[in-house]
From Swiss-Prot:
GO terms for cellular component: cell-cell junction; cytoplasm; cytoskeleton; dendrite membrane; dendritic shaft; dendritic spine; plasma membrane; postsynaptic density. Changing Y363A: Enhances association with the cytoskeleton. Diminishes the inhibitory effect on SRC. This is MAGUK p55 subfamily member 2. Changing Y363D: Enhances association with the cytoskeleton. Its main location: cytoplasm. The modification Phosphoserine is found at S42, S145. Residues 249-317 form the SH3 domain. Residues 185-240 form the PDZ domain.
Length: 576
């Protein structure tokens, strides 16, 4: 078969070589010869010639082994060389850029509007998200086969399994690995996602480091880290491989609710390997194998680093030193110590604000969602900071898109009042019964009458196809922050004292307001604003400083428009 194949290919090549002398010998037109050469050089014609040759062998009852058949057609080479790779793994971001560009022309072009509609379809978005997940290989590794012997991996490593690994680096450059002592040996404890070693893939967790540039490493992890950090040029590591299967990162994203600086952390195994972040940052957790230290990276990009785990940070924040005091009869040096008895409390809704102050906020798992419209817009802020003015302006600006609830009250209606216009009127007994049944988002009493917002009123506005705009107390956000109401929480922050005083003075002069606030009132507003931000800042999606009502309103409009065109990070409980 190989001989026949060679002869057939040689014959075709001879025809091609002789085409150059055909014009003078046959008088053929040059254009026709070019056409003939194209046919002869066509891969299809060459394949047909090979098929004819194979059919001839079959007619002659000549057996040809499959390996020669594959080699003859070149199939084995194509199978080895063909490797499909994704062009990119961030197609969702590309689509969002396209949608932003289409937003400018969608109103003038029906084709652009139709394209924008297709690109925002949930099925299409899910397809892109699945493609990006496969392209970036962020899928979970299947569990190991139960048939494998667990003791197999614990067998001693033969001496000939020692490997030499070469790495080129500059002095001071971190390799992205940490070490631990195990059985008197230095073992790779973790490999930081995105680091030099992780990118090269030459080292694995569990590998034993024996030598660095021919020098034994001993058993001190800090000394080895210092040696590797200061090394430059070519670094040769002598290792005993662990043969452990690497774990692919799982897609876990969290929103941080505290600031962290590894340089100030005395517990971190390696300060240089730590990842700094601030409250509100979004991180991807790429490794949670260690109970105390996770590996994470910022969603915007960059190398991974170590961060304290949920368990470690909870222990650290919950730890309170025992209050010690000397007993009345004790001496200065030899007296006994007694601890103050701690107060124990059961959770009560009436003590909701008290428990909020002691809530431990570490990480919140979130998920990235395609653009969608929120059902409620919640404005939080101190009294007198301008929440109600912003709510009214937003509803007047687009009454078809935004709406609000009608509050309920137990007071009797005035002669000029009508049911549902300004207030809904019910008896005090009925309202108290509904409050006990949990049908009110919030309620209060003023001059002997009850006032409140019913949860069903919010549902009614949402059912009408509108975004329900609410200006409520911060405690109410905990009730609203569910998959049913998917709120967008905006904190209206009070400006500094001088700006607030100037705003009140300008409102009086223009006739917008008739109430002159005292300095005590203004300072109370600033202090209350700071207190709300400290206690409930983890619930806020956006913070706006209301130093100018018109500018703040425009910023609020812009933020609401972005929700329709840009991806959003929401609590994972809203999705699953």
């Amino acid at each position: 078969m190989p001989v026949a194949a060679t002869n057939s290919e040689t014959a075709m090549q001879q025809v091609l070589d002789n085409l150059g002398s055909l014009p003078s010998a046959t008088g053929a037109a040059e254009l026709d010869l070019i056409f003939l050469r194209g046919i002869m050089e066509s891969p299809i014609v060459r394949s047909l010639a090979k098929v004819i040759m194979v059919l001839w062998f079959m007619q002659q009852n000549v057996f040809v082994p499959m390996k020669y058949m594959l080699k003859y057609f070149g199939a084995h080479e194509r199978l080895e060389e063909t490797k499909l790779e994704a062009v990119r793994d961030n197609n969702l971001e590309l689509v969002q850029e396209i949608l932003r560009d289409l937003a400018h022309v969608a109103e003038q072009s029906s084709t652009a509007a139709e394209l924008a509609h297709i690109l925002q379809e949930p099925h299409f978005q899910s397809l892109l998200e699945t493609h990006d997940s496969v392209a970036s290989k962020t899928y979970e590794t299947p569990p190991p086969s139960p048939g494998l012997d667990p003791t197999f991996s614990n067998q001693p490593v033969p001496p000939d399994a020692v490997r030499m690994v070469g790495i080129r680096k500059t002095a001071g450059e971190h390799l992205g690995v940490t070490f631990r002592v195990e059985g008197g040996e230095l073992v790779i404890a973790r490999i930081l996602h995105g680091g030099m070693v992780a990118q090269q893939g030459l080292l694995h967790v569990g590998d034993i480091i024996k030598e660095v540039n021919g020098q034994p490493v001993g058993s001190d992890p800090r000394a080895l880290q210092e040696l590797l950090r200061n090394a430059s040029g070519s670094v040769i590591l002598k290792i005993l491989p662990s043969y452990q299967e690497p774990h692919l990162p799982r897609q876990v994203f969290v929103k941080c609710h505290f600031d962290y600086d590894p340089a100030r952390d005395s517990l971190i195994p390696c300060k240089e390997a730590g990842l700094r972040f601030n409250a509100g940052d979004l991180l991807q957790i790429v490794n949670q194998d260690d109970a105390n230290w996770w590996q994470a990276c910022h969603v915007e990009g960059g190398s991974a680093g170590l961060i304290p785990s949920q368990l470690l940070e909870e222990k650290r924040k919950a730890f309170v030193k025992r209050d010690l005091e000397l007993t009345p009869n004790s001496g200065t040096l030899c007296g006994s110590l007694s601890g103050k008895k701690k107060k124990r409390m059961m959770y009560l809704t009436t003590k909701n604000a008290e428990f909020d102050r002691h809530e431990l906020l570490i990480y919140e798992e979130v998920a990235r969602m395609p653009p969608f419209r929120r059902k409620t817009l919640v404005l939080i802020g101190a009294q007198g900071v301008g929440r109600r003015s912003l709510k009214n302006k937003l509803i007047m600006w687009d009454p078809d898109r935004y709406g609000t609830t009608v509050p309920y009250t137990s007071r009797r209606p005035k002669d000029s009042e009508r049911e549902g216009q300004g207030y809904s009127f019910v008896s005090r007994g009925e309202m108290e019964a509904d409050v006990r049944a949990g049908r009110y988002l919030e309620h209060g009493e003023y001059e002997g009458n009850l006032y409140g917002t019913r949860i069903d009123s919010i549902r009614g506005v949402v059912a009408a196809g509108k975004v329900c705009v609410l200006d409520v107390n911060p405690q109410a956000v905990k009730v609203l922050r569910t998959a049913e109401f998917v709120p967008y929480v905006v904190f209206i922050e009070a400006p500094d004292f001088e700006t607030l005083r100037a705003m009140n003075r300008a409102a009086l002069e223009s006739g917008i307001s008739t109430k002159q606030l005292t300095e005590a009132d203004l300072r109370r507003t600033v202090e209350e604003s700071s207190r709300i931000q400290r206690g409930y800042g983890h619930y806020f999606d956006l913070c706006l400083v209301n130093s100018n009502l018109e500018r703040t309103f425009r910023e609020l409009q812009t933020a609401m428009e972005k929700l329709r065109t840009e991806p959003q990070w929401v609590p994972v409980s809203w999705v699953y």
